[in-house]
Amino acid sequence: MKLLTASVTPFLPDHSIDFLSFENLLRFQERESHGVVLLGSTGESLSMTAKEKESLVSYACSLNLKVPIIVGVPGTSLHEASEWIHTCQSYPIYGFLITTPIYTKPGVHGQTLWFESLLNKANKPAILYNIPSRSGTTLYLDTVRSLAAHPFFYGLKDSGGSIKHCQEYAQMSSDFVLYCGDDGLWPQMYECGARGLISVLSNIWPKEAREWVEDPHHQYRADLWREVSSWLNQTTNPIAIKALLAYKQVIAHNTLRLPLSIQDLQCAESIPEIIKKMAQWKYSCAHV
């Protein structure tokens, strides 16, 4: 799985799940053979109840997609995370994305035991997620080293923004797949040893994302993708990507759940310009 899409969760204006838009989004990804990651930070999982999350996973699995489904496992409660993994075992998903514990800032021993416990329960391939900007701590190198040989440690998603740290992960073991978790850093992280991308921008540009992953050295595309990624990162994810998806009518509404708000998108007036810029992608074969 070289490319996975970190899927948004579409909501209706009353903040309930918009299942029609959700199916449209997943079919959009299926056409380009992308795996999907549900209920990560892009999917606003922390704002959803356990019942809502299960309904989303159940609905996605009922679509019989021809691409793998990976489900996010966030939180700080080991019991709740374990129960969520147990719930998901009832569905034909491919595996899990297990986030570094948020807010509690454990040391290396606590973090290692946390991941080991959840990997033992997973019984499916799992991707460990380094996201220090949200969790408050990095995914420690010693934790990765200790767990590298675990049979369910399939991959590592690195959204830490440090090329040096990415290199250290890549040099540690060939037993797991290293995924870039930042659209704009794909070329640099590929050079460091990343072999896959978990993308936010592929929600709206799945074909372009596939071409981007297959040819990270195309300078014109790299510059264009980096510019759009920079625009996206002006505000907290998934505010901007939802605005783009709604503008392009991939989803019906740009609704977010508090504490996220579409009013925090200060660059909304530039959405048509961003769409126009990405329309140049199809001419990129003339720019090498």
UniProtKB/Swiss-Prot annotation:
Cited function: Catalyzes the condensation of (S)-aspartate-beta-semialdehyde [(S)-ASA] and pyruvate to 4-hydroxy-tetrahydrodipicolinate (HTPA).
Subunit structure: Homotetramer; dimer of dimers.
Active site: 129 (proton donor/acceptor), 157 (schiff-base intermediate with substrate)
Cellular compartments annotated: Cytoplasm
Organism of this sequence: Chlamydia abortus (strain DSM 27085 / S26/3)
Listed pathway(s): Amino-acid biosynthesis; L-lysine biosynthesis via DAP pathway; (S)-tetrahydrodipicolinate from L-aspartate: step 3/4
Gene Ontology biological-process entries: diaminopimelate biosynthetic process; lysine biosynthetic process via diaminopimelate
Protein name, UniProt field: 4-hydroxy-tetrahydrodipicolinate synthase
Keywords: Amino-acid biosynthesis, Cytoplasm, Diaminopimelate biosynthesis, Lyase, Lysine biosynthesis, Schiff base
Protein family membership: Belongs to the DapA family.
